A protein has these predicted regions:
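Extended, charged catalytic domains and RNA/DNA-binding interfaces, predominantly
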Residues: 1-91, 95-112
């Protein structure tokens, strides 16, 4: 499953992390692997440093369908303020771009 999602062993790791009460961080994995984690996990996940792919199409950012899955999972996505992950074409990060990211992310608020 290299670059294509979780292997069977990867699914077992997620299940073991759930049993141990560990958070599963979906940052730095492919979108397919994110989807697999969200399918397998029994606990909320975290994306400790990720941004919206729709705003800045970087491979480490999270596509909208996964943002929706994280919301359903009651997980947390924390914005990565590295400019290449927030602003298209790696221009220097400015307050307006960060505000755009924040406003976009408000589409996916906590379920409560």
């Amino acid at each position: 499953a290299r670059h294509g999602g979780l292997t069977e062993f990867g699914e077992e790791v997620v299940q073991t992390m759930n049993e141990l009460g560990m958070l599963v961080d979906i940052s730095h994995i492919s979108a397919d692997a994110m989807r697999d984690v969200l399918r397998v996990t029994k606990a909320p996940v975290i994306a400790s440093h990720s941004s919206a792919y729709a705003i800045a199409p970087h491979p480490r950012n999270i596509p909208d369908d996964v943002l929706k899955l994280v919301k359903t999972n009651r997980g947390v996505v924390m914005v990565n303020y590295y400019s290449a992950y927030v602003v298209p074409e790696s221009v220097a990060s400015r307050a307006e771009e960060l505000a755009t990211e924040r406003e976009y992310r408000l589409k996916y608020p906590d379920p409560d």
